[in-house]
Structure formats: structure tokens, C-alpha cells
Amino acid sequence: DVMIFVSSSPSRGLDSGDRLSGTRWVELVNQAYGSMFTDYVIHCNRVGYEDGKNFWGGSSVVDPNGEFLLHGTYFEEALLTQTIDLNDLHRTRSRLPLLRDERPTLVQRELARILMENPS
């Protein structure tokens, strides 16, 4: 229901705009995980300098729809807090037919049948 990622993502080159290319990819992945798994994604990224490397910060919280609820500033330390409502998970999942209509016992039974028919 909640994925927590802690990273030390260093700053790398600029993308087509004024953002670092690494920030764009990390944020896209976090949004994709949030919406694909209909989970909250909490990402805490290191900020500051160490051994000649710069870490960009930008910690965030993404909701089960893949939208940012909270986004920290880049290149600055911050203490961020965000309240999440786990009931939003049920509401979001009930709107998605793939998850709403999931039948895990059927899948388990069919996988067991396939394995029995094709032992390796």
C-alpha cells in the first residue's frame, strides 16, 4: 500500500529544459509506480555535497493516481511531512477494472494446474 524509496541520486546533466535529467527520470518512475500499483510512493533523496558529488534532494510523496501530493525543493535541506489517507487506495482501486475484477484464487488455481501439466 505504501512504497518507500530512499536514494542518494547524484546530480547529472540538464534535460531539454532547466531540470537535471536524473530528477526527471526519478520523478517519472515514482509517478509510474504510484499509478501502476495504485500505491503511495514516498521518495526520500539525499541532498548536499560529498566527495565532489552533488545530490539534488527533491524528496516527494506520490498518491495512488500518480500525482504529487508533496514535492521538496531541489538542492536544499528540508523536513517534509504529508498525511496520507489509506482509504484513497480503496477508492482508486475500485475505479480500475484490472484491480477491481482481480480474482487471485482463480489465478492461483490455474497456475497450479499449468505447473502440474508441465512439470520441469
Where are these regions (language model features)?
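Cysteine/selenocysteine-centered motifs that mediate thiol-based redox chemistry or coordinate metal-sulfur cofactors
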Residues: 89-120
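CN hydrolase (nitrilase-like) catalytic-core segments centered on the catalytic cysteine
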Residues: 1-80
